C-alpha cells in the first residue's frame, strides 16, 4: 500500500527559507517547485491506474496536523487495521531506518515544540513570503495547487508571466548553492514555464509536447 502526503508547496518553501541551519544549502526555488510538480504528476497517474486500485492513500499535510485523529483513523481504515490513539502520540515516534531514537521535530521554524503535533506553520507562508514570491510560486505550480484543492492568492491571473519572475530565476541561477534540476539558463527556464501555460490555455493534443511539460501524455487537471 502506498501513502502519499502532499503539502502546500508555498508552506514547504516558506519553511525552507526559514531554516536556522546556516550550513543548509537551499535548492533553487524553481527546482524545488518542479520536483514537487513531479510528485503530483506521478500521484495523479497512480490514482488512475488499475495497478494501484485500493492500494494508495492520499493525505494532505495540513489536514493531518490539524486533525491527526481523523486522518490517521481514515488511513487505518484504508489499511484495514485498528486505530489506536498511541499512533498520534509523538512520545511513541521514532526516527527512520536504523535511527530508533525518539523522534524530534525537523521543521525549518525555530518555535516548534519538542512534543505534540504542531500545526502553527500551516498558513505562516502568508506572512513570511512576500507578494512576488507567492506570485512566482503560483505561476510555476498553480495548476497543481488547484488540482489538489488549494486556493490561490492570484487565482485570476496566476498564469500571467512577469518580468520579476524571470529576475528570481536569474538571481537564483547565479547564486543558488543547493541542488538544482533547472537548465542553468534563466531565459530557457522562464520560456519553458510560459510555454507550459500556453499548452494548458490552448488544450494542445501533441503527446510529445504534453509529456515534455507534464511528464505523462495525459494532463490530470484538464
Language model segments and positions:
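PAPS-dependent sulfotransferase catalytic domain
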Residues: 1-89, 93-112
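PAPS-dependent sulfotransferases, especially Golgi type II membrane carbohydrate sulfotransferases
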Residues: 81-222
Amino acid at each position: 500500500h502506498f501513502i502519499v502526503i502532499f503539502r502546500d508547496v508555498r508552506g514547504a518553501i516558506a519553511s525552507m527559507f526559514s531554516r536556522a541551519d546556516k550550513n543548509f544549502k537551499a535548492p533553487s526555488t524553481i527546482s524545488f517547485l518542479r520536483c514537487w510538480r513531479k510528485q503530483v504528476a506521478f500521484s495523479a497517474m497512480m490514482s488512475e491506474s488499475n495497478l494501484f486500485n485500493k492500494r494508495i492513500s492520499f493525505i494532505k499535510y495540513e489536514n493531518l496536523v490539524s486533525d491527526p485523529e481523523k486522518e490517521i483513523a481514515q488511513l487505518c481504515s484504508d489499511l484495514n487495521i485498528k486505530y489506536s490513539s498511541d499512533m498520534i502520540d509523538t512520545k511513541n515516534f521514532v526516527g527512520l531506518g536504523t535511527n530508533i531514537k525518539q523522534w524530534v521535530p525537523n521543521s525549518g521554524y525555530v518555535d516548534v515544540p519538542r512534543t505534540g503535533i504542531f500545526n502553527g506553520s500551516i498558513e505562516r507562508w502568508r506572512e513570511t513570503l512576500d507578494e512576488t514570491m507567492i506570485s512566482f510560486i503560483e505561476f510555476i505550480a498553480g495548476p497543481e495547487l488547484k488540482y489538489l484543492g488549494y486556493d490561490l492568492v492570484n487565482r485570476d491571473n496566476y498564469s500571467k508571466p512577469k518580468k520579476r519572475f524571470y529576475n528570481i530565476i536569474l538571481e537564483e541561477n547565479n547564486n543558488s548553492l543547493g541542488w538544482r534540476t533547472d537548465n542553468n539558463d534563466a531565459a530557457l527556464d522562464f520560456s519553458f514555464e510560459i510555454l507550459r501555460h500556453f499548452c494548458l490555455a490552448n488544450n494542445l493534443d501533441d503527446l510529445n509536447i504534453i509529456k515534455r511539460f507534464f511528464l505523462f501524455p495525459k494532463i490530470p487537471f484538464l
